[in-house]
């Protein structure tokens, strides 16, 4: 069948007075032009998004790191995606992923006891359960949904501390994230200090691995994403910057030097999910962070991924 088709092509070329060689040259040239056009379109789109992200930095007097992955098309949107930022409380979603990776679902029913001395600043859930303790699953949920800092420290302890967390990320391909301290010291975010830092690209890649990749089986992925969908601290962040009919599961973070972050898995209707990491910082230690910056950045992403 293939030989007959080649014969027909040869006859057609002969009739038109074109050699097979010239036909190949013509089609090859057309393909090259098409490839150049597509490359140019992508480059133009990247330049446009870079300009918009740069304008947001000027508007809010902040440094911005962005990485988004359309898991259906593998298209990415990025800006300062390889620059380091303090990850702040965004680690809690990924640490919960590590916890699920290293333990059976039954382990989530284990009751963990802790004392008043274990409590650190901003522990709205754990502070109510000093006398009774909490199930490990409840602690993980408190860390992700309420950003409870004592719960975050307990997660760290259950996975081998900050360095255990870092090691677990290395095993899924992250060669960037540095994890060194517990809550609340990890939120210092001193410029130039690489402790407790990562990049938007590394964090987004980790979140993708735990929520849609192979780092967790489907049943555990569902547990993690349900915790993230119930996040009580992200309404003014990525969730505010995407269409209202998109489902968002996120984990926010905040620290000194105007650090404000949000990472999310976002489900547009009838489309594969999008993974988004948005990190930000400012120059002054006591600078106030801007939720609106984290809300406006995803508007650029949504427009670019259409």
UniProtKB/Swiss-Prot annotation:
This is Beta-lactamase 1. It comes from Bacillus mycoides. GO terms for biological process: beta-lactam antibiotic catabolic process; response to antibiotic. Substrate binds at residues 251-253. The active site is at 89 (acyl-ester intermediate), 185 (proton acceptor). It is an enzyme of class 3 (hydrolase). This protein is a beta-lactamase with a substrate specificity for penicillins. The gene is blaCI. It comes from the Bacteria.
